[in-house]
Amino acid sequence: MARAFLFVLDSFGVGGAPDAAAYGDEGADTLGHIAEFCAAGAGDRAGLRSGPLSLPNMSELGLMHIARAASGQFPAGMPLPEKVYGVYGTANEISRGKDTPSGHWEIAGTPVNFDWGYFPTEGDAFPPELIEALCRAGDVPGILGNCHASGTEIIARLGEEHIRTGKPICYTSSDSVFQVAAQEAHFGLDRLLTFCRIARGLLDPYNIGRIIARPFIGQSASTFQRTGNRRDFSVLPPEPTLLDRLLQHGRHVHAVGKIGDIFAHQGISRVIKATGNEALMDASLSAIDAAEDGDLVFTNFVDFDMNYGHRRDVPGYAAALEAFDARLPEVHKKLKPGDLVVLTADHGCDPTWRGTDHTRERVPIIAFGPGIRSRSIGVRRTYADIGESIARHLGIPAGPHGRSFL
């Protein structure tokens, strides 16, 4: 039998999406622009990193060639490896959204072929009847925010008023989300999660993809910071995913990080919580040790998106990529004959782009493991090819939406 390890570098797009213009993202290229800025010295930060972007391990697995296939050019300032050892390619997204659930579900073989509900960008974001029902059911005196906002900005702006009044901070973005920020000690973490569960039920008729609990600590705008107790309350995928199919065939799915939340805990055998990319890698390595024949370990490395992409932080994103790349040899050392590792992303979030939202981009596909022969798999029609390749590797029947590249 075989094992598979699927690592999603959240938001690590490689540009070139053929439909990017329809999303206002023509020219967006997360990898390409980070490399360009680093090569020009704009990715330097004292005490963090300096110089051109350096990803030697992913480059040897085909990342440079992926970038050229996706966007038409090699990333600036990054040397070409003498030899490529991985299976490498890039994929288009066929789901209509450029959000986290759409990307992950499509990776798992289930594209999202419907439109999510979204909130208006002008005026109040949420209908009065929704707010009234939520405040009544959630036993709060009102809400703050009621707008599109950056999470860190709105906490800094409204956090002190939230502490004084007990009103949760509710906001949204260009994604199909309803986000609730509350101070852990003053409002209470359990109360926040209960409030979000209530919101999940009330928002189902609006077809909103996720309710996100955003707890924070601190007493003033200068000291507020988010904690690792974030929770996502997602709707169920529209049809069985790779995860469900694996469970149906007696396999186990080890969900590391926020994977369990993204799939509404459907198709999951074991949830492993960790906060931050370093801890997520540690947890993934432990899950590799625990995985049995036929199992899947599925990890989302969220820091790229949450801490650096949305915040448009080029040096931070570059440093996080370099730190991830430096730990790949630890993954290699864990592998046994029959193992397969796949690195990919769920969308882009170009830290040089206007605004703070995701960007529509192609994503990288890197696959490697003992006995895996290096080759290009070109540009794939859909992320679903990733899930179908894992299905084939693990010996379960193919699904309807993708084609294996193995």
From Swiss-Prot:
Enzyme Commission number(s) of this protein: 5.4.2.7
Native organism: Rhizobium etli (strain ATCC 51251 / DSM 11541 / JCM 21823 / NBRC 15573 / CFN 42)
Biological function: Isomerase that catalyzes the conversion of deoxy-ribose 1-phosphate (dRib-1-P) and ribose 1-phosphate (Rib-1-P) to deoxy-ribose 5-phosphate (dRib-5-P) and ribose 5-phosphate (Rib-5-P), respectively.
SUPFAM superfamilies noted in UniProt: Alkaline phosphatase-like (SSF53649), DeoB insert domain-like (SSF143856)
Cofactor(s), names only, from the UniProt record: Mn(2+)
Residues noted as binding Mn(2+) 2 in the record, renumbered to the chain: D305, H310, H358
Chief localization: cytoplasm
Chain positions recorded as Mn(2+) 1 binding sites: D10, D346, H347
Listed CDD domains: PPM (cd16009)
Pathway where this protein functions: Carbohydrate degradation; 2-deoxy-D-ribose 1-phosphate degradation; D-glyceraldehyde 3-phosphate and acetaldehyde from 2-deoxy-alpha-D-ribose 1-phosphate: step 1/2
Any single Gene Ontology cellular-component annotation: cytosol
Family, per entry: Belongs to the phosphopentomutase family.
Subcellular location: Cytoplasm
Coiled coil: none
The protein's name: Phosphopentomutase
Manner of cofactor binding, per the entry note: Binds 2 manganese ions.
UniProt catalytic activity: 2-deoxy-alpha-D-ribose 1-phosphate = 2-deoxy-D-ribose 5-phosphate; alpha-D-ribose 1-phosphate = D-ribose 5-phosphate
GO aspect biological process, one term: nucleotide metabolic process
A Gene Ontology molecular function term of the record: phosphopentomutase activity
InterPro entries: Alkaline_phosphatase_core_sf, DeoB, Metalloenzyme, Phosphopentomutase_DeoB_cap_sf
Keywords: Cytoplasm, Isomerase, Manganese, Metal-binding
Cystine crosslinks: none
Enzyme class: isomerase
Designated gene of the protein: deoB
